[in-house]
Amino acid sequence: MQPKKTKFRKAHKGRIHGVASSGATLAFGQYGLKATEPERVTARQIEAARRALTRHMKRAGRVWIRVFPDLPVSKKPAEVRMGSGKGSPELWVARVKPGRVLFEIDGVNTQTAREALTLAAAKLPIKTRFVERIAE
């Protein structure tokens, strides 16, 4: 996962301040996985979590990925001296604030959803919690 086109090739590191204001509530599915701490999540981690989710659900139900890795992270090659500019873009990450919903699922029962999202959470570098839509 990475953007098709970006305005700039390299980006500043930046910091993750505050809590998520947008993307903090369930928008599509019945169950979700919500971040409880700030961290950068890579495209590979998101993909690994998605695979764990879909495998456990046995292709039943529907999955929504609510984060997208749009920040390039640059890296210098191994054993290269400091200086000579910034390294080339190596991977793509998504900045995740606390309270952000990462994944949403629907079409499965509560127990299956909880198990699937727990498996997905194990693939991510952040603490998360299971959230459920309250019936109105």
Curated annotation (Swiss-Prot):
Transmembrane segments: none annotated. GO terms for biological process: translation. Keywords: Ribonucleoprotein, Ribosomal protein, RNA-binding, rRNA-binding, tRNA-binding. Signal peptide: none annotated. The keyword rRNA-binding applies. Pfam families: Ribosomal_L16 (PF00252). The keyword Transferase does not apply. SUPFAM superfamilies: Ribosomal protein L16p/L10e (SSF54686). PANTHER family: 50S/60S RIBOSOMAL PROTEIN L16 (PTHR12220), LARGE RIBOSOMAL SUBUNIT PROTEIN UL16M (PTHR12220:SF13). Part of the 50S ribosomal subunit. Belongs to the universal ribosomal protein uL16 family. Binds 23S rRNA and is also seen to make contacts with the A and possibly P site tRNAs. This is Large ribosomal subunit protein uL16. It comes from Bradyrhizobium diazoefficiens (strain JCM 10833 / BCRC 13528 / IAM 13628 / NBRC 14792 / USDA 110). The lineage of its organism: Bacteria, Pseudomonadati, Pseudomonadota, Alphaproteobacteria, Hyphomicrobiales.
